[in-house]
Amino acid sequence: MIKLGRSIILTVFLVLLAFPVPSWATKNPAHLFFSHSLLQGRDFSNQSLPAAEFANSNMELANFDHCDLEGAIFSKGILTKASLKQANLTYAMLDQTDFTEADLSDAVLVEALFLGSTFHHTKIEGADFTDALLDREQIRQLCRIASGINSTTGISTRDSLGCR
């Protein structure tokens, strides 16, 4: 009887090993999943939301000031007129995102992905784009308005973009 019990426990253990929990399930519990959501005007300021998912969400006028969003996913999101002042967006995926009239002042955007994103009338004073993935046209556009030094990293916005 004891051997049968041990065999069952061993079998269950091996089955669990064969079907591990997906990495996204352990890294991103449900409270950090906001994809495909209407989040206009929501206040996320001063929150710690690393690896949160906001893909395909409308976050117009949302407040992410002083937010830790390291590794967050905003792909194909709408951040029109949103405020991300002093937010940490290191390693964030911000591709195909609309930043029209958004405020990225003093944000840390190190190694963030911005391909296909739009920056019409976006505030970037003091933002650190070090090693961020931007296309040439985005860099030209941002260099025209780049100014300031990031208060967290000490890097100038112009230097982080490689402006001449």
Regions found by a protein language model. Give the residues of each.
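Tandem repeat scaffolds
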Residues: 2-9, 15-164
